Curated annotation (Swiss-Prot):
Its main location: cytoplasm. One of its GO terms (biological process) is coenzyme A biosynthetic process. Homodimer. The keyword Transferase applies. A monovalent cation. Ammonium or potassium. It comes from Clostridioides difficile (strain 630) (Peptoclostridium difficile). This is Type III pantothenate kinase. Substrate binds at residues 100, 107-110, 184. The active site is at 109 (proton acceptor). Its cofactor is NH4(+); K(+). Keywords: ATP-binding, Coenzyme A biosynthesis, Cytoplasm, Kinase, Metal-binding, Nucleotide-binding, Potassium, Transferase. GO terms for cellular component: cytoplasm.
C-alpha cells in the first residue's frame, strides 16, 4: 500500500492507495509544533480505527508547503512506517515541463495538481485549488505548466473581515440566499461568497484569454471547491482528490 501526504498550511490530507484505488483518507490539522512521535500516535490511532495495519505500508510520498512540518513527518515515516519517504521537490520525476522563471519557486501542491490534471483531464486546462490561499494554474495545449495566480483564500478573507471590523462577527461560510440581506450575518455571507465567486470567474476569464486556446477545461479542488463551484459560471469539474491522485501518479513515475 502507498501512503500519501498532502500537507497544506491549515490541514493535511492523508490517503492510502492499493494500486490506483484510493481506499482510505483522513483530514487532520497541520500542526507545526507536533513531534514525529505525536504524529505517530495520531496517525496510528486513525489507522487502528479503520483497521489499517501500518506494517502494510510499502512506500510513502509527501507533498508539503509547510517546511517546518517536514522533519517531523519524515521521522514519522522512518520510525513508524520503516520507510524513507519520497518528497516532492527538486530532482523528483514529474514529467512536467515548467515554464516558470524559477521552477524551484513553484509550490509542491501546484506541481502535484498539474500532474494529476493533465493525466485525468488533458490539456489545455486551468486548475483551481481552494486552500489557505487559492491558486490558479494554467496548462498549455502541450501540457506545459505556464504559471498562474495566487489569491487570498476565502477563509483568510472572511477572517480578515472579522478581525478588522470590530462590530462584525465571525460567520460560517455558507451559500447565501440573496444579496439584499436582512441580517448582518447573511449580509456578510453574501458579500464573502458572491464576492469570491466574482474573483474566481474574473481570474479564469482573463486566464482563458491569455491561454488563447479552444476547449480549456477548468478543474477545481480543495475544501471549499464545491461551495464556490456551485455558484460560478466557469468551473467544469470538481475533484476533491486531485492532489492525492497527483501524488500517486508522481510516485509511479519515480518507480519507472
Amino acid at each position: 500500500m502507498l501512503l500519501v501526504f498532502d500537507v497544506g498550511n491549515t490541514n493535511m490530507v492523508l490517503g492510502i492507495y492499493k494500486g490506483d484505488k484510493l481506499v482510505n483518507y483522513w483530514r487532520i490539522k497541520t500542526d507545526r509544533e507536533k513531534t514525529s512521535d505525536e504524529y505517530g500516535i495520531l496517525i496510528s490511532n486513525l489507522f487502528d480505527y479503520d483497521n489499517v495495519n501500518i506494517s502494510d505500508i510499502d512506500d510513502v510520498i509527501i507533498s508539503s508547503v509547510v517546511p517546518n512540518v517536514m522533519h517531523s513527518l519524515e521521522n514519522f515515516c522512518i520510525k513508524y512506517c520503516k520507510k524513507q519517504p519520497l518528497i516532492v521537490g527538486p530532482g523528483i520525476k514529474t514529467g512536467l515541463n515548467i515554464k516558470y522563471d524559477n521552477p524551484k519557486q513553484v509550490g509542491a501542491d501546484r506541481i502535484v495538481n498539474a500532474v494529476a490534471g493533465i493525466e485525468k483531464y488533458g490539456a489545455p486546462s486551468i486548475l483551481v485549488d481552494f486552500g489557505t490561499a487559492t491558486t490558479f494554474c494554467a496548462i498549455s495545449e502541450k501540457g506545459e505548466y505556464l504559471g498562474g495566480t495566487i489569491a487570498p483564500g476565502i477563509k483568510i478573507s472572511s477572517e480578515a473581515l472579522f478581525q478588522s471590523a470590530s462590530k462584525l462577527p465571525r460567520v460560517e461560510l455558507a451559500k447565501p440566499g440573496m444579496t439584499i440581506c436582512k441580517s448582518t450575518v447573511s449580509a456578510m455571507q453574501s458579500g464573502i461568497i458572491y464576492g469570491y465567486v466574482g474573483l474566481v470567474d474574473k481570474i479564469i476569464s482573463i486566464m482563458k484569454k491569455e491561454l488563447n486556446c479552444d476547449d480549456v477545461k477548468v478543474i477545481a479542488t480543495g475544501g471549499l471547491a464545491k461551495l464556490i463551484a456551485s455558484e460560478t459560471k466557469s468551473i467544469d469539474y470538481v475533484d476533491g482528490f486531485l492532489t492525492l491522485e497527483g501524488l500517486r501518479i508522481i510516485y509511479e513515475k519515480n518507480q519507472e
